[in-house]
Amino acid sequence: MLLLELPVELLDKIIELTLPDSLESFALSCKTVYSVGRDYVRSHNLHKQRWTCFRYDNRGNTDHGFKTPMELLVAIYEDPLIASYIQTADFWQKDYNEEQIARLKKRVLEDDTNLAAIGGLLGQSHYLRHANQDPEQWLAEMCWEEGEGDEPRDAYRGDHYSTNMATIILLTLLPNLRELILPNEWLSLPEPNDSPPAKQLWSVLDVITCEAGLRPLSNASLSRLNKILPYAHVSYRDRNALIELNPFLPIKSVEHMHIANCVAVDDGHTGIPFTWRNTGQTSNLRILELAGCCIDSDGITELVKHTPHLTTLKYSHHVKWHGCQYDWDAGNFVRAIEEHCGSTLENLAVTIDSLDGMVETGVDSMQGFQRLHSVELDILVFAGPPPGSGLRQGTIDNGYKYDISKVPCLADILPRSIKQVSLFVPSSTGDADAGIELQTLASLFRQYAPSETLGQPDLVEVHVGFGHAYAYADEVRQIFDAHNDSSKPNRLMDKWHVDPTITDRKTWVEDFHEKYAISYD
């Protein structure tokens, strides 16, 4: 029997089953199908307009839109198609009002109809079943209110447990999601451990990861997820743990991760360690941007040794609460990236937002990067002893200070494949020697002897920027004016056949902040 010979009732049911992905192509295939499916087309267009790009309402004290995950769960229960239309989910409320959100959550959950709707979703969830979770217990936990004398369940980062439960349920319902911005409360996600609250949440997150990873481009939730976008401002006091992103890292469709303010440091004090959760799995990440983060060499090692396809990595260092990474081991940080991503990385940026102490070891060689075309580096990443020297600088219990004149020439550091180089004089540091940046720059561009041959045949651009450090502009130019002295042949720039561009061009992280509207506190 031909399709158009089917009874109208059956054809109507077939059209309904094409929602949302295939409706447009099917409905427009012929007049008969379009005529039967006219109401579906109208509903489809309304759903696309309303739900393709979902974000919480941020307009203060209004009753327009949704401000809590509980409200969205109720809407999805009443109209399950909503979940299939959401392709971008922005759960971050930048003008977050915790008291207002708490009142709204309470109002939603005090309504018996809403409670029944959320309970219905929980009861239908095969994710909860596979995680051996009791839907009734989840509903009770989501309705829990912290009383006087109760201990917060989220350790030292506040109590947003029930909101994170609701968000996790949302993450089980979004098969067509492409871009995700996590909510404010995600920083309160408990670290994975054996405590009942942590096991309760992470058991479901593990099922989400497994289903999305094993069933790409299927109806599994998050199986089409491609980008994780920033969900926090850069802050000294507030810290997002890199482990919060563990559920998304192994999902094969996730190729881009742009995040801010994450910590991956095991210092036994104020750091938050990062451990790769999904043993035996690797990430399919291609592009990774870590803005205003606080990660040591061990933390970055634990991450990048599981990213075999990474082509772009950009990192800016930011000291966190109580001086976490006050001194930073830049040399071993870059060496770890080189060891694990040297054969794939094409673009690398390592810059410094804030450094109250010293660079413990400096970058002395990047020869292990086999495909690196573009590099953007803060001048200070070179201002320390080589990682293999056994020497370390530090402001705490360490009197050693590296002789900046021993910083290798830039030509000895860069790999043969390099095409573009951007170096930045930082706008502010805590180092007692205010001239250390300029001394480092002078060492990097010192003269070469006539007999020496440079090994960067494809280099076409060398850029030296001073960002907001305008006071350094004249000093930077003087360094290159000295090198441009015609009485000194074979200077580095002549050998490279390029002239340095000296401007106030923005660093990658400044562009990042503008693009994603990220602020510093």
Enumerate the predicted regions with their spans.
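Beta-propeller domains
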Residues: 235, 242, 250-256, 260-312, ...
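Leucine-rich solenoid repeat modules
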Residues: 76, 342-521
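Acidic/polar low-complexity surface segments
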Residues: 121-139, 143-147, 263-272, 317-327, ...
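Concave beta-strand-loop units of leucine-rich repeat
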Residues: 91-95, 182-187, 229-236, 258-265, ...
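Leucine-rich repeat
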Residues: 11, 39-42, 67-78, 81-88, 161-170, 173-179, 192-227, ...
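N-terminal adaptor/linker regions at the entrance to substrate-recognition repeat cores
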Residues: 2-266, 520-521
